[in-house]
UniProtKB/Swiss-Prot annotation:
BP GO annotations: translation
High-level lineage: Bacteria, Pseudomonadati, Pseudomonadota, Gammaproteobacteria, Enterobacterales
InterPro entries, per database record: KOW, Rib_uL2_dom2, Ribosomal_uL24, Ribosomal_uL24_CS, Ribosomal_uL24_KOW, Translation_prot_SH3-like_sf
SUPFAM superfamilies registered for this protein in UniProt: Translation proteins SH3-like domain
Top-level taxon in the UniProt lineage: Bacteria
Molecular function as annotated in GO: rRNA binding; structural constituent of ribosome
Protein keywords: Ribonucleoprotein, Ribosomal protein, RNA-binding, rRNA-binding
Organism: Proteus mirabilis (strain HI4320)
Reported function: One of two assembly initiator proteins, it binds directly to the 5'-end of the 23S rRNA, where it nucleates assembly of the 50S subunit.
Protein name stated in the entry: Large ribosomal subunit protein uL24
NCBIfam families, per database record: rplX_bact
């Protein structure tokens, strides 16, 4: 099945502590999760690695979020939208369900 949310898509968070925030998808994981830029930040306690000249400390990084908790953001309407699929010139393309506009 084709992916409704892909890398570089702008998404909006539907539920959780970051509800309403927008960001770009950095990575789509096979476990049904996505990593979104600037969303679901967690503090990671990192040990120093002298061999790589890497300092230790507390680092903030993005954690994965369920793909069902995000929706693609439609810039034309300014709201979250649903994704549909259709064939154009023999190719399967994604489109916004609200205004039938093709995605990228």
């Amino acid at each position: 099945m084709a992916a409704k949310i892909r890398r570089e898509d702008e998404v909006i968070v539907l539920t959780g502590k970051d509800k309403g925030k927008r960001g770009k998808v950095k990575q789509v994981l096979s476990s049904g999760k996505v990593i979104v830029e600037g969303i679901n930040l967690v503090k990671k306690h990192q040990k120093p690695v002298p061999a790589l000249n890497q300092p230790g400390g507390i680092v903030e990084k993005e954690a994965a979020i369920q793909v069902s908790n995000v929706a693609i953001f439609n810039a034309a309407t300014g709201k979250a939208d649903r994704v549909g699929f259709r064939f154009e010139d023999g190719k399967k393309v994604r489109f916004f369900k609200s205004n039938k506009e093709t995605i990228k």
